[in-house]
């Protein structure tokens, strides 16, 4: 994990020198949960603030409001509308340990739920984040490549990149289904500590740069 950590640190250093205009995920401020007010300015700052405020509100709310906040973050903010009612209820009500034990299944959704549990401890893991972590190792010609789970995507470029990854990664180290998320968090935390930043900034950078990294291979 040391090699990918050093690659990620260098990648972050280059991009954090800019004004962070690389993050373009816009928030529909017309459907924000009650009591949430976002700062003016860049999307990256708005999204960090949203995570922090949602976590604060979640931690002080009853189970009904907790569930509503998680559903907002998965469905409205995240745009994931494919979960059935039963699955969404599971994500809304179960503790972190049970969600993490799901492994790859539904990780793009349940990792969003975990951000509300604690935005400083947990981070989103989705197809773009995974793709960036894998492609950074290709670009930097890593000697000991670690395959982060390849997740389905609605984005054509990500889907094509995933097909290529499956072809070339047969000899990569495969992360166990019940361990990859904790290793991912460990990687983010060690990187964040070295850079004196937070794990949200690193996750958002990985999300934002996925298609750009694909184009470099």
Predicted stretch roles:
Residues 2-99:
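Long, highly charged, low-complexity intrinsically disordered interaction regions
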Residues 1-30, 126-132, 136-217:
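C-terminal accessory module of base-excision DNA glycosylases/AP lyases that mediates lesion recognition
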Residues 67-72, 111, 127, 200, ...:
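Non-catalytic, well-ordered alpha-helical scaffold segments
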Residues 74-82, 113-120, 133-136, 191, ...:
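Generic structural signal for hydrophobic core residues of well-folded globular domains
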Residues 123:
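Short Cys/His-based metal-binding microdomains
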Residues 94-118:
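Helix-hairpin-helix
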């Amino acid at each position: 994990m040391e090699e990918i950590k050093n690659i990620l640190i260098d990648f972050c250093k280059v991009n954090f020198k800019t004004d962070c205009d690389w993050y373009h995920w816009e928030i529909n401020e017309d459907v924000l949960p009650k009591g949430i007010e976002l700062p003016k300015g860049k999307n990256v700052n708005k999204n960090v603030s949203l995570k922090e405020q949602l976590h604060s509100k979640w931690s002080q709310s009853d189970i009904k409001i907790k569930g509503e906040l998680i559903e907002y973050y998965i469905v409205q903010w995240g745009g994931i509308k494919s979960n059935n009612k039963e699955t969404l209820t599971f994500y809304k009500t179960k503790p972190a340990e049970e969600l993490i034990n799901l492994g790859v299944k539904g990780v793009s959704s349940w990792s969003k739920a975990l951000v509300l549990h604690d935005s400083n401890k947990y981070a989103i893991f989705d197809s773009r984040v995974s793709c960036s972590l894998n492609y950074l190792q290709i670009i930097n010609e890593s000697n000991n490549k670690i395959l982060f789970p390849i997740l389905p995507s609605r984005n054509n470029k990500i889907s094509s990149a995933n097909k290529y990854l499956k072809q070339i990664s047969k000899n990569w180290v495969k992360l166990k289904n019940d361990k990859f998320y904790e290793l991912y968090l460990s990687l983010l935390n060690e990187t964040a500590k070295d850079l004196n930043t937070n794990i949200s900034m690193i996750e958002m950078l990985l999300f934002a740069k996925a298609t750009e990294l694909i184009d470099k291979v």
